[in-house]
Amino acid sequence: MKNRVTNIHFVGIGGVGMSGIAEVLHNLGFKVSGSDQARNAATEHLGSLGIQVYPGHTAEHVNGADVVVTSTAVKKENPEVVAALEQQIPVIPRALMLAELMRFRDGIAIAGTHGKTTTTSLTASILGAAGLDPTFVIGGKLNAAGTNARLGKGEYIVAEADESDASFLHLTPIMSVVTNIDEDHMDTYGHSVEKLHQAFIDFIHRMPFYGKAFLCIDSEHVRAILPKVSKPYATYGLDDTADIYATDIENVGAQMKFTVHVQMKGHEQGSFEVVLNMPGRHNVLNALAAIGVALEVGASVEAIQKGLLGFEGVGRRFQKYGDIKLPNGGTALLVDDYGHHPVEMAATLAAARGAYPEKRLVLAFQPHRYTRTRDLFEDFTKVLNTVDALVLTEVYAAGEEPIAAADSRALARAIRVLGKLEPIYCENVADLPEMLLNVLQDGDIVLNMGAGSINRVPAALLELSKQI
């Protein structure tokens, strides 16, 4: 690609998946530019690297580009896309550019409905501890690196593989991981579980014959596809029939301690203890996937232990902001999380309970997309009803039109009928920080959760707290 392409322009460069690829390409020596409707931390970071980031979208931005890369949020009517096509400049999706990056390195692609970002981050952490200096592109900021992407000198690139639009089928990794499969983004698959399964099978089969997949057998849908997988694979999970499994799992504060057992073909059989520097049984599974990849590339047990214990977390994945001051003179622990599907929400809430069993659990939640709220309405009401106090803000539409009886007011009514909780409704997410300060009590843990504009709440809450 380097002999034919010099200038690469990203439309929607501020998106978490786009900004990481842009940064790696910039560090590889390409001339990178981009545009976005809104400034954010990602665009500021890219600008500090010397990348030209334009505010808004106009046709002139693509002048001189050899290729234009778009995110899934960018419509074909976008003026930059229209101008590029008129000038016969290739317009490609983000995943296709990620696939090109994998041609420079041996690719390790992490797929699954939940846990991709954490598993990718843990894998990068262990490979780094093993001295393998990987390149990584992650859907969240790796706290230890201060960025969501980095160009390493080693032979591996670790990246998330996105199933939401089936774009992971562009990738050709030498190793792949499937953390789980759940019924999400079903509009992409014609609301067919069979088509969803086939997409993951096709993703695994994108590997060469010498590749290897690591598949989580704790997921019912993953177990269902195993008979159809014809490429080499190993299983992992909490069951002792898996090739890599965990026992003796215990919470040690906000960490997880467990024993790893390896009975994988071609590897030394045995067991060893690890401490994972994050809470939750679901993160034990994510760690097992990273351990499997690490063993396959030759990392030592010591490197695995170091990478897991020294893991500093990733942005918006049970990200602890510490204690905030309350108007009543007490304090509450603020934690931020990206969870927006009932399955991952339940796992994160269980992690919070396990790490802080003595605290009252307060959840501030912003549903993401009306279609998801409608399709999983009953599952949402069940998981939301498990907390001690609940504040709901309106659905983040993500470009969708409102759907009757699939909004936060409807969720609040359904939860109220169950009789355990009295949900508090906050129509405008901008009012949420002040409302939370009035709801919280001394010693609480407040979990700020959702994939939309609620991500701005922690900073605003911290600022308000400082004024007390």
From Swiss-Prot:
<dbReference type="GO" id="GO:0008360">
    <property type="term" value="P:regulation of cell shape"/>
</dbReference>
<dbReference type="GO" id="GO:0005737">
    <property type="term" value="C:cytoplasm"/>
</dbReference>
<comment type="pathway">
    <text>Cell wall biogenesis; peptidoglycan biosynthesis.</text>
</comment>
<keyword id="KW-0547">Nucleotide-binding</keyword>
<keyword id="KW-0132">Cell division</keyword>
<feature type="binding site">
    <location>
        <begin position="112"/>
        <end position="118"/>
    </location>
    <ligand>
        <name>ATP</name>
    </ligand>
</feature>
<dbReference type="GO" id="GO:0009252">
    <property type="term" value="P:peptidoglycan biosynthetic process"/>
</dbReference>
<comment type="function">
    <text>Cell wall formation.</text>
</comment>
<dbReference type="GO" id="GO:0008763">
    <property type="term" value="F:UDP-N-acetylmuramate-L-alanine ligase activity"/>
</dbReference>
<keyword id="KW-0131">Cell cycle</keyword>
<protein>
    <recommendedName>
        <fullName>UDP-N-acetylmuramate--L-alanine ligase</fullName>
        <ecNumber>6.3.2.8</ecNumber>
    </recommendedName>
</protein>
<dbReference type="InterPro" id="IPR050061">
    <property type="entry name" value="MurCDEF_pg_biosynth"/>
</dbReference>
<dbReference type="GO" id="GO:0051301">
    <property type="term" value="P:cell division"/>
</dbReference>
<dbReference type="InterPro" id="IPR036615">
    <property type="entry name" value="Mur_ligase_C_dom_sf"/>
</dbReference>
<dbReference type="InterPro" id="IPR005758">
    <property type="entry name" value="UDP-N-AcMur_Ala_ligase_MurC"/>
</dbReference>
<keyword id="KW-0963">Cytoplasm</keyword>
<keyword id="KW-0133">Cell shape</keyword>
<dbReference type="InterPro" id="IPR004101">
    <property type="entry name" value="Mur_ligase_C"/>
</dbReference>
<keyword id="KW-0436">Ligase</keyword>
<dbReference type="Pfam" id="PF08245">
    <property type="entry name" value="Mur_ligase_M"/>
</dbReference>
<keyword id="KW-0067">ATP-binding</keyword>
<comment type="similarity">
    <text>Belongs to the MurCDEF family.</text>
</comment>
<dbReference type="GO" id="GO:0071555">
    <property type="term" value="P:cell wall organization"/>
</dbReference>
<keyword id="KW-0573">Peptidoglycan synthesis</keyword>
<dbReference type="Pfam" id="PF02875">
    <property type="entry name" value="Mur_ligase_C"/>
</dbReference>
<dbReference type="InterPro" id="IPR036565">
    <property type="entry name" value="Mur-like_cat_sf"/>
</dbReference>
<dbReference type="InterPro" id="IPR000713">
    <property type="entry name" value="Mur_ligase_N"/>
</dbReference>
<dbReference type="Pfam" id="PF01225">
    <property type="entry name" value="Mur_ligase"/>
</dbReference>
<dbReference type="GO" id="GO:0005524">
    <property type="term" value="F:ATP binding"/>
</dbReference>
<dbReference type="InterPro" id="IPR013221">
    <property type="entry name" value="Mur_ligase_cen"/>
</dbReference>
<keyword id="KW-0961">Cell wall biogenesis/degradation</keyword>
